[in-house]
Amino acid sequence: MGKDRLPELLQRSLSTNSSNSSSNGSLLLNVYSGTTEFIIGNTGGNNNSYSVVSQNSHSCSNNNSSTEPKDRSSSKMTQYGSNVDDILNPYTEIRQQLAQIAANLETMNRMAQTVNLRTFNENEMDELHNKNLRLGNQLMTRFNDFKANLPAENDYSLEARMKRTLFYGLHQTFINLWHKNELFLQNYETKVKKNLRLHTKIINSEASEQEIELLIENKTTKLFVDNFLQETEKERQTLREMMDRFNELRRLEKSIEEVHALFMRIQTLVMEQSEVIQRVEFHAQQATLHVDKGADELDQAEQHQKKARKKKIMLIVILAAVLLVLLLVGIYL
């Protein structure tokens, strides 16, 4: 049923303006979204969504039966259904991973609102953050693979424009989603620092900015609970020793995470700027082909020149022989 809707919606994209790649791309994304939502609805056993789509398909068939030109156009577009599926299916997992990142980010936003409550689980927050990092790495690898297999920029066929528009649309969605994730992490860190400053003031322990950073690195964000757990001076001393031992390791871990995030940002910028580099490379390849072709043509011209010289010599010899024969005939006669 989802496949039956694809040719009809793709026909609308073609009938509006075949040369407008942006409008075709937006309609293609709408087709893909509608197909995905329909498949999810069917797997979940939602009969209401199936009936709505059936009614829409029935109304579309009634309208098409009233206008014969639309019927002919619809019959012509059915042959493109498999091609559209081939374009959309490879991006299904990417869309699912983007949805997973968005869901994790929404969950972390809800958890950040309860950071001061007992129900807040910092380990769960770290787990969601690590999941987003893993998904981001996987998506970056997938986008690199799809980027390498995109059609050439000088290919203006409908299928090529669909592939390019779908790729750049999903890639921009990933970039926007990742920017939101980084903004959330910055806001969350600021909120945690603010809470730690407030807690230190309440327990009459003024902490410097460096000490607050150290508390965050050691995931010590609940000073009231920690204060009750550290009932004796021995336990406090043990905690200080443990913090000193793992301080350098935490700093190293944080530095590695920052470098990793920096490399991901650089990789995103490189992908955004790679289009110009690919065009330059394309023109360089074309110039190389033309140079090779010119060399072949020069070789052919040289061969033709040699053949022409041989023909000229043969003609001169023949003419000399004819003149000699005529002279001899004239002398004897």
Swiss-Prot record:
Cytoplasm as a keyword of this entry, yes or no, is no
Supply one GO CC term from the record. Answer: postsynaptic membrane
Q: Where is the composition biased (Low complexity)?
A: 50-66
Cytoplasmic-side segments: 1-312
Q: How does it sit in the membrane?
A: Single-pass type IV membrane protein
Disulphide bonds annotated for this chain are none
Q: Where is this region: Disordered?
A: 50-81
Sorted alphabetically, which InterPro entries does this protein's record hold?
SNARE, Syntaxin, T_SNARE_dom
- Which residue windows are coiled coil? 91-116
Q: Where in the cell is it found?
A: Membrane
Spans through the membrane: 313-333
Ordered alphabetically, the record's keywords are:
Coiled coil, Membrane, Neurotransmitter transport, Transmembrane, Transmembrane helix, Transport
- State the protein's purpose: Potentially involved in docking of synaptic vesicles at presynaptic active zones.
Q: Which family does it belong to?
A: Belongs to the syntaxin family.
Q: What is the protein named? A: Syntaxin-4
Gene encoding this chain?
Answer: Syx4
